[in-house]
Structures are given as structure tokens and as C-alpha cells.
């Protein structure tokens, strides 16, 4: 019988196969992969954000183009641009009183909103209870896709005990008529070249009881601002004053602005400073919801232009005057 001789050494241990451990990651390798992925995401996110904002700005430009086209169609049929606001007398206060029928109301048939036009009772005014369902209707072409604000404004209700709940109608002041809920417009017509109340002697294209014709635009339609974006400064809650947005049917600062300034919502509430309007006669300038601060606008010839907040103030003022006889600069932020 053959006997196996002991060598005195422990039996050999087979080393693990290289193929068996090839699929596993070490901790260092995993951390490297995570770091690479984080870097790629950090590089791609700004590009994605910029692409989305560019798409929103293009949609906003299309809204402005459609409004400009509607104004031109109105002028073609009526031989004059619509009144910026229709009322018995001015100056116009940004408070829910009077008729205050806006230029947007006149444009409803040209914005494919014939149903709203038929149901709006112009003789009753923008704040009449009979017009509540109409003025609470959101019109998509009046909303900027980049807006951080809502498309509907809720008017506050106050009583002697302080702010009332939104659904309360107790002690509704008689000077604050219905409706309390209104749809807004992020676009406004140009009523004047400097800060001034909305009145019949304004220098812009759309103002109190106006009926501007092309022959009245002595500076040239391509050099006269027709409409542009606007942003609203913040207002304290439960305070009804000149800061309230009275909706697209109201021919107040809700739908009319001047070329005194271009504001960007990207600067935040602090950018408004002392220009927060407390006086109901205050109108304010145009503004933008876009990240870049670009304000999309339409000229009187229908062309769509883009302004920046750092536009030359003199150039901006000149564009807001239809017949000042001055030659606007060819640069300066437009």
C-alpha cells in the first residue's frame, strides 16, 4: 500500500480568480465616478436652464407679437388705435372706481376671445359685478411664461377687526366694488414718455380716451413704443392701494405704463426702493420677468424688440413719445 508522506507544510490555499473580482468597485473608484457625474451635472444644468429660459422668452415674444398684430388689425378696421382707457374724465387713479375700460377689452375680438367680448358690458365698467365672470377669465396670451407672479389677483377685504378671510364679504367697503378676483395681464401699453398720471394729454400710443392714428406718429412707427412687458412691485397683504393689480380689463397701471424706467424682477423687491407706488396716480415703467432682465416689447410698426434694464434713459424716453421730433439713438440697450 502506498502511503502519502506528510511534508509538514499546510495545504496550499487557492488564490481567488481575477475574473471573479473584476466586477467590483473599490471605494476610491466609486468616489471618482460620483465626482465625475456631479461635475457633468454641474456643467449641464446651466445649459438646460438657459435653454428653458430661451424657450420661455420666445413664447413671450410670440405673445407680444400677437398683441401687436391685434392692435394693428383694430387700427385697420377702426382707422385708429384703441383708447388706452375709456372713462369720463382723468387723471386715472389705480383704484377700482369709474369705468376704466382698458384697451385689452377692445382687442378681445382680435385675440379670438369673441365670447368674452360679447359678455363684457362696457357701459357698466371694468369693476361691475355683471362683468365679474369675464374679468376673472385668464387669457393665456396675456401671461408671460417666465412670470413668477400669478395669473389671478385676489383683492383684499378689510373690516374693522382687521383683515378678513378671502371668502368673507362682511363689511366690504362701498368704494371697493365687485369683483374681488381678476385675471391679470403681464403686458402693458405705452401711455407716456415720463412718469405722469394717465390723462388725455399723454404723449404715448395708448392713454385716456385716445384715438392715435398712424399719421399722428410723427417720429416714425418703428421708433415709437407700442407695448411691452411689465412687472408689479410687491404690496403689503390686505392693503388696497395703488399697488393692487386691477386686472386686464382695467385701464390703470395694470395695463398701461410709461418709459420712465425698465425694471427686472430678477433684482428682487429691493430693486424697487422708493418707487413702490402708494399714490394711486403713480403709473410706473415697464419691466421683465426674464432671468436676463430682457424686456420684450412691440413697436408701433409691429416689430418685436428687446430692451435691457441698462437701456439709455434718454433713448427710452424718446421711444415713449410719438411726436417729440428727436432722433433716437441706434444703440444704448435695444
What are these regions (language model features)?
Residues 21-56, 66:
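N-terminal single-pass transmembrane signal-anchor helix
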Residues 39, 43, 54-334:
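Surface-exposed loop/linker segments characteristic of extracytoplasmic
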